């Protein structure tokens, strides 16, 4: 009887172990990213003054609201008794009201972006297994930052992705170059999310002043990784190409190690490692 009990217990442990491994694999395989539509609640409050929308912003999205008010718009502290009035008044500007309307029209549906994010982060997790996918949400700023990353969250400012030929972007007083405007469209949302996310995980060294070449090479590593996660060439520069050549000639180099270690480009454009 004792032998039978031990045998049954062993079988149970094996089954539990198998189930745990399958569940872990399934969890990894079932990565599904959905952009939370904080922008819709924000838009409702800023266009109608609906107090219930403001309450939902503060209760359901406290961190997003704090980040928007204090770090993006920089109009005061979220605990300021008058901050709600300041927030509403700030967006009564005709230009900002136009931006809100345009963003909500262009991004009424973000299913394509959700799918792109899901596919890209799935590939990124294969390349860098220990990363945790941030909570991603959409917001509307005032033509400031494109993507905000911090505290396990990533915010997409839809006002910075209204299209290459969006009228406001073409105005001289905003000073956007043709090169900048090429990236201010829907197609660059996911690459930008990945890029800024990777920058937050692998920040540029601050313990010394970097040369321009080192900065360019650093960005090249980030952009090359984004290309791999996107499964297409979004960024095509001398530095991304050199990183690609380097990785092919160093098959044992992991992406995580590549992003952590210092590399430089010799005059011959050959990518090599160097130690500090």
Which sequence ranges carry the predicted segments?
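C-terminal motif of bacterial Sec signal peptides marking the signal peptidase cleavage site
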Residues: 14-17
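Acidic/His-rich structured neighborhood in mature extracellular/periplasmic domains
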Residues: 86-276
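Short, intrinsically disordered low-complexity segments
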Residues: 1-2, 20
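N-terminal mature-domain "stem" immediately C-terminal to a signal peptide or N-terminal signal-anchor/transmembrane
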Residues: 19-89
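Sec-dependent signal peptide recognition
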Residues: 2-9
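Exposed boundary/loop context
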Residues: 10-11, 134
